[in-house]
Amino acid sequence: MWTVQNRESLGLLSFPVMIAMVCCAHSANEPSNMSYVKETVDRLLKGYDIRLRPDFGGPPVDVGMRIDVASIDMVSEVNMDYTLTMYFQQSWKDKRLSYSGIPLNLTLDNRVADQLWVPDTYFLNDKKSFVHGVTVKNRMIRLHPDGTVLYGLRITTTAACMMDLRRYPLDEQNCTLEIESYGYTTDDIEFYWNGGEGAVTGVNKIELPQFSIVDYKMVSKKVEFTTGAYPRLSLSFRLKRNIGYFILQTYMPSTLITILSWVSFWINYDASAARVALGITTVLTMTTISTHLRETLPKIPYVKAIDIYLMGCFVFVFLALLEYAFVNYIFFGKGPQKKGAGKQDQSANEKNKLEMNKVQVDAHGNILLSTLEIRNETSGSEVLTGVGDPKTTMYSYDSASIQYRKPMSSREGYGRALDRHGAHSKGRIRRRASQLKVKIPDLTDVNSIDKWSRMFFPITFSLFNVVYWLYYVH
């Protein structure tokens, strides 16, 4: 009951106040009051000197800043800048513009701003800025009875943003907007964020195609120059790059091209046209991807994260092409050389056999034999007669490599038999060794090279990806 009575009493008290406000607003539009407002504005501007700041010679003027971010239009890695559109508001108190008799704020034409003192605010890292002028110049001037001036502008500025692209495109960037007084030092003017944490609005509504705004920070500080100390406000945006675009446009194509280059390991090694065409195509494709990426980035002296990945993919693709070059050399290079060497050895053996079969007879009727070394120990073929027979005769006459048969003792015949047995033993050992060599895999076999490549390339490329993503993501 008591609550209902309080509400009724409050309603009765507020009703006269509302009537008074309506009457004042209505009276301001009356011709007599319009002339009074005109006289008030004329009186404020009469004798006003825009060359002097408010309270000249006294304490510094406190200028409050508010920013309503409309959009971040572009972030350029090539130019190292970003474009920002905002509603920029400044407020300060100028006692020369205080008035009485009109309990209303006076919103004046934007051209009146040219007749009033305004702070010499500028953007320190600005490259190009302009105030919008459609349909009229987008600026506002509003006066309060206590002399407070509200000055608003709609500005689009392109500000420098120095980026560290070592982790590109897995990077985060900090882009700032530096607001500073150009001529007035801290003895004449002070800047502050009007509204504290609420001085900057509209950031949460912004959506960028390649970035996400993780956080923003407002800073107020003083900077020292040779001409004095100046006030500075900083608005810093923390931008995190979205990786989805680069996965679809760069990482995935590079990975697929690298895997495609391994198809040559399953193609027959004598299909030179197919394997060479595939290898060259993959190498040129990787080169095209790298070239296109470099065109969209500045020419910086350090290596970026995406450069390391593309370089790794290019190395794997190039090694796949070199692998076939090695296989081709083994199969088509050494093969004919070995075959030619084998034919030369065979012809030399046949020539030696013909020379061994030649029989010469001297004038006395003796058989002449040239001194030849035993070429084949496994054959055991020797010119032996009457082994163990003491009557067997072989005469020897050493002159110009001529041998005559002379009688051979039983001891010499026994030694010949032992030599023949040793030759047979050596032949068996060599045949056994050749059988063992067949069981050992030949490292120059082209099929084994392709088989090892089918396992080596995917495993090493997978390890490369694991190390790369663990390092740059974390």
Curated annotation (Swiss-Prot):
Query: How does the protein associate with the membrane?
Result: Multi-pass membrane protein
List the InterPro entries. GABAA/Glycine_rcpt, GABAAb_rcpt, Neur_chan_lig-bd, Neur_chan_lig-bd_sf, Neur_channel, Neuro-gated_channel_TM_sf, Neuro_actylchol_rec, Neurotrans-gated_channel_TM
Question: What positions does the entry give for 4-aminobutanoate binding?
Answer: 182, 227
Instruction: Kindly report every residue range on the membrane side named Cytoplasmic.
Output: 328-451
Pfam family of the protein (one): Neur_chan_memb
> What GO MF annotations does this protein's record show?
G protein-coupled neurotransmitter receptor activity involved in regulation of presynaptic membrane potential; GABA-A receptor activity; GABA-gated chloride ion channel activity; ligand-gated monoatomic ion channel activity; ligand-gated monoatomic ion channel activity involved in regulation of presynaptic membrane potential
Q: What is stated as this protein's family in its record?
A: Belongs to the ligand-gated ion channel (TC 1.A.9) family. Gamma-aminobutyric acid receptor (TC 1.A.9.5) subfamily. GABRB1 sub-subfamily.
The keyword Hydrolase is annotated on this UniProt entry: no
Q: Name the chain's protein.
A: Gamma-aminobutyric acid receptor subunit beta-1
One GO term of the cellular component aspect? Answer: GABA-ergic synapse
Q: Which UniProt keywords apply?
A: Cell membrane, Chloride, Chloride channel, Disulfide bond, Glycoprotein, Ion channel, Ion transport, Ligand-gated ion channel, Membrane, Postsynaptic cell membrane, Receptor, Signal, Synapse, Transmembrane, Transmembrane helix, Transport
Q: What does the UniProt record say this protein does? A: Beta subunit of the heteropentameric ligand-gated chloride channel gated by gamma-aminobutyric acid (GABA), a major inhibitory neurotransmitter in the brain. GABA-gated chloride channels, also named GABA(A) receptors (GABAAR), consist of five subunits arranged around a central pore and contain GABA active binding site(s) located at the alpha and beta subunit interface(s). When activated by GABA, GABAARs selectively allow the flow of chloride anions across the cell membrane down their electrochemical gradient.
**Which subcellular locations apply to this protein?**
Postsynaptic cell membrane; Cell membrane
